[in-house]
Amino acid sequence: MTSKTSESGTGTQSTIVQLRNLPDLTEISHLEIDAPVVEILKKTVLFQLNSLNICISNFALDELVNLVTVQMDGMFRNLHNLTLLQRRSQASQADLKLLLREFNLDAPSLYQQFQASEFIKSKHSTEYEKLMSWSSLAALPHNEEDEEDELNNIEEQQNEINVLLPPSNPLEKQIPSWLPNFPPDHTYKFTPEFNHPITDLKTIKKEIVKESQESEKALLNLNKSLSHISSASNTPQPPGLDDEDAIEQQLEIWGNALEERKPTITEKSFNENNIEQYAKYRVELARERVTKFEVNQLKRTKNPFLKISETLYLPESPHQSHKTIQKTIELQFRKSMTLFMHNLPKVQKLKKEKIRMAKEERAKSLKRRQEELISQRTKREQDEGHDLELLLNNEHARDAADDTTTPNALNNSTIVINTNAEDEDDDINLFGILGSSEDENEMSSMPAENLVAESEPPTMTAQDTTNTTPVAHNTTNIDATTSHSPHSTPNENAPTSPPADIATDHDITM
């Protein structure tokens, strides 16, 4: 042991102690144990190579020895795992068979190598005896005293565990001294416990009654939940505008291929304690499962690949080689491919025909729908025009009756067209229900003089036409207001309703 002192830049001294010889411990080199085993392995490999007249370098020999050690360690490790899985302390013949099958080895090849090694052993007897002497020297002495010490250690460990965790078995005192004690209770913690069958009839009946009550409660809860769901689903929804048209169009395009979903029993409301409906529901479910199973079985019988695989790989089928199985599968695959290529043009032609028919049906349905809409619109316009004509005739008759009393008021009245249809509505609400019409452009192209001449009543004079204000087109609401001139005097005996002035075709938008 040596000690050194050194001074650092800050002025402090540090002492370094170095141990060269261990005073109380004895150092054992690993070469004393590993080197003889490695040397014996090298000599065995060289012994096998010498019998085959093969020369090898030292580097190649080291690599070959490493490869042999890795392979042997893997085999021994796998054998150890197999014995542990089978809960054995030593490897059995079945474990060795599994190991050989895992490494793709068979007994005849091993026996052939054994005969070759026996021949080499007899030919090179002197070298073999030297190798055996080396292996006997490297083996550690094994005495019976060591076995007794190991057994004593196991007993001591067992006693220590029993002291820490004594077993709770009452039969512990009856065990003789030459037998081992019971293990602690934690060893039985994860062992399975088998069910104890009930043989008493009274307890069996009680359990049956209890289970029936629980099932009845479950059925009642199920009925309540289903009734709640059905009541929530039966709430009326706002009707869609084009739902019926869409359904008709789909039926016309796709024909009978469109299958409507049948309403299940779950959509109906279950009453409380109604076991009959629940039983019907269960029967329907069972039928659906049976139909699904039958469809799958039918598909399996029609599928050629599944049929071939079942006939080839079933245990009842005769044994066949892998090549024959592969050939049959390839042959069936080629047949299916040729059939597919043969039927592909037919399928494409059928697909085009179906698409063409669907397009024609869709065009017909759209045309029929358009004609229906046009007929409905024309009928609605005719009805609205007839009603409007009656209203205008009534207003003209009222104006003719009022001409005798208030001529000046009628001469100075004008029509103001409300261009902002969203802010104000007409007082009479005559034109609020009218929509746009396609005849508006045709009417606007006609001369204004003809329109004015057609709309004038027989009692109106030329002075009345000069007092009318210009009319704004494309309006939806008309606000009829009267503007009196300073020369006109109001008439107290006039009717309370607003007078109807001159209405031209430009004023009315259909």
Swiss-Prot record:
Sorted UniProt keywords: Coiled coil, Nucleus, Phosphoprotein, Transcription, Transcription regulation
Annotated Low complexity bias: 465-477
Residues with Phosphoserine modification: S269
InterPro entries, per database record: TAF8 (IPR037818), TFIID_su8_C (IPR019473)
GO biological process: positive regulation of transcription by RNA polymerase II; transcription by RNA polymerase II
Pfam family, one: TAF8_C
Subcellular location: Nucleus
Domain named Histone-fold: residues: 37-103
Region named Disordered: 361-382, 459-510
Gene Ontology CC annotations of this record: nucleus; transcription factor TFIID complex
Major site of localization recorded for this protein: nucleus
Record's function text: Functions as a component of the DNA-binding general transcription factor complex TFIID. Binding of TFIID to a promoter (with or without TATA element) is the initial step in pre-initiation complex (PIC) formation. TFIID plays a key role in the regulation of gene expression by RNA polymerase II through different activities such as transcription activator interaction, core promoter recognition and selectivity, TFIIA and TFIIB interaction, chromatin modification (histone acetylation by TAF1), facilitation of DNA opening and initiation of transcription.
Assembly, per entry: In TFIID, TAF8 heterodimerizes with TAF10. The 1.2 MDa TFIID complex is composed of TATA binding protein (TBP) and the 14 TBP-associated factors. One copy of each TAF1, TAF2, TAF3, TAF7, TAF8, TAF11, TAF13, two copies of each TAF4, TAF5, TAF6, TAF9, TAF10, TAF12, and three copies of TAF14.
Name of the protein described by the UniProt record: Transcription initiation factor TFIID subunit 8
Organism, scientific name: Saccharomyces cerevisiae (strain ATCC 204508 / S288c)
Gene name of the encoded protein: TAF8
